[in-house]
Amino acid sequence: PAVRVETVEPVGAVGGGSAPAGRRVGSVALVGAGPGDPELITVRGRRLLAEADVVVADRLVPRLLLDELRPEVELVDATKIPHGPAATQEEINRVLVERALAGATVVRLKGGDPYVFGRGGEELLACAEAGIPVTVVPGVSSPIAAPAAAGIPVTHRGVAHEFTVVSGHLPPDHPDSLVDWAALARLRGTLVVLMGLTNLPSIVAALLAYGRDPDTPAAVVQEGTTGAQRVLRSTLATVAADARSA
């Protein structure tokens, strides 16, 4: 198995930096691991994993991809569990920069796509400020893949000509929420809510209050594209209660 570093050390935010004299600067690749099934990583993403000296991985990354790393690879666990112990983004940025400045080929492996609720943009900026070359490898994103695996097309001729992806991490009435739920309720297309199970009752209440049809078909997909996938089909009016009793 790869060399495993269970957590990153708590240090300050990354600023600039430079490689030691006479040592080449390494590189960082922000790689999307896909929605859960390890076979859904891109060909390029898998190749970069095979070439990496250091892999910094999140909780949502398929374990099989990590088990296949070369024995000498340093695996840094950047687990970010919602509402629990977490490596701060500044710590993760610091590890990426530090390892690359030491000459390593670093892969930042993230569930789904690096730029879809993955803070890939913040990591790109941290590396750019330190003068480190960055490659971005898009990943198959769960807002499309999970519905597809459940047999639900996000667009369908004559039914949905658009789909919208939003975070459900914050409830609709939270002061930090940037989501316009009133506007979403007026749309006719498919609405995909990520990280929304905890706040599902308040999300449903907001959409209904703003006029979304209570008979709108609704589904909850858990562990999409994996062997543990579960799908609940319902309507907007009843999905919160159905999910609670499932």
Where are each of the predicted segments found?
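Class I S-adenosyl-L-methionine
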Residues: 1-38, 43-140, 145, 240
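A contiguous loop/helix-start segment that scaffolds small-molecule binding in enzyme catalytic cores
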Residues: 1-28, 101-106, 162, 167-246
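Short secondary-structure transition/capping segments
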Residues: 69-70, 89-90, 147-151, 167-169, ...
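Short hydrophobic/aromatic-enriched beta-strand-loop microsegments
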Residues: 73-80, 131-135, 154-164, 211-220
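Short, solvent-exposed amphipathic alpha-helical segments in soluble enzyme
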Residues: 43-48, 69-73, 122-127, 151-152, ...
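Short, functionally important structural connectors and interaction interfaces within domains
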Residues: 32-33, 52, 57, 84, ...
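Alpha-helix boundary/capping detector
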Residues: 75-81, 92, 153, 172-173, ...
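Class I SAM-dependent methyltransferase SAM-binding "motif I" and its flanking Rossmann-like core
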Residues: 111-187, 230-233
